[in-house]
Amino acid sequence: MATLSQKKLMESVRLMEREWVKMHKALVRSRCGEVKEVRYRYVEMIGRGSFGVVVKIMDDRHNFFALKRVYQDRRYHNRELGILMEVDHPNIVRLVSYFHTDKTSSGAYLNIITDFVGMNLEEYIKANRGVETEEIRSVYRQILEGLRYLHEKNICHRDMKPSNILIDTNGLVKICDLGSAKVIKSGERNITYICSRFYRAPENLLDYKEYDFKIDIWSVGCVIAEFRHPGPIFKGDTSGSTLNRILEIVRVTSDDLIGLGCLKPDLKQGVGIRKYLEAFFSDPDLLEVLEKSLAFSPCKRSTASELLRKQFFQQAHE
């Protein structure tokens, strides 16, 4: 059964496609609190999810932006807007302004206007199979720079995947869609059913609630592997089959599983993530970074700062 937010989302989609082809006026509030009137019109749908739609809009000066519209139920707090107002980094999408519309006793539409970047990494990878290692290095570094910034602010993205990473024609990378992002604290218990299944870290698949920022590192390792691997590396129809796929490839010890609250006596050793990826990547320094990103145990998985100090990312600066 569709939730109230999902029903409102479907109504919103129909409204956009029908009425937003003409210029609209709106009083918006910038990230610094300034209120002003803007004019914009709908250009095209960029994407839609369970709780929001993203459209390309154009203002009266012919500048393009992305507008994310979600139905904000009054009973729940929207963390994304607060996080976007706090962050400011070249590798994270920038909040331009926001406004509410159609306010009722049950809620309102929240409209978040951000930078428009023409392509996401899912599209980029499909169009650039066999891309040079130098380009992979640039993309990987920029993602990690953005994550290091978020993690230093105790913000975990919790939904890193190719479609949530944008790249422009100059190769500038921006992390987007902070709808699942949250400030997390050490030892805090959080929901584990987050992040798209193919990019979900083992601790989430095992329902280990005291996870940390390392889940983002795992997800990004999965994303980067797709530059050469034919599709998601840990593809499964269910959480269980995704976990089994991980166990087939990644070397796991009994202690790794016990540390995540799981006992699996019949554990069989995977081939090893590095050995598996050697069929697709030849650069030993890149393989080292991927191996550190895709360690099964979060205790053995590197942080963004640690990865950025690896030889693979130093080469471009030498």
Swiss-Prot record:
SMART domains reported in the protein's UniProt record: S_TKc (SM00220)
Mind telling me which Pfam families this protein's record contains?
Answer: Pkinase
Where in or outside the cell? Cytoplasm; Nucleus
- Keywords, alphabetical: ATP-binding, Cell cycle, Cell division, Cytoplasm, Kinase, Mitosis, Nucleotide-binding, Nucleus, Serine/threonine-protein kinase, Transferase
Q: Which reaction does it catalyse?
A: L-seryl-[protein] + ATP = O-phospho-L-seryl-[protein] + ADP + H(+); L-threonyl-[protein] + ATP = O-phospho-L-threonyl-[protein] + ADP + H(+)
Broad class of where this protein is predominantly found:
cytoplasm
The protein in question is named: Probable serine/threonine-protein kinase MRK1 homolog
Q: What is the lineage of its organism?
A: Eukaryota, Fungi, Fungi incertae sedis, Microsporidia, Unikaryonidae
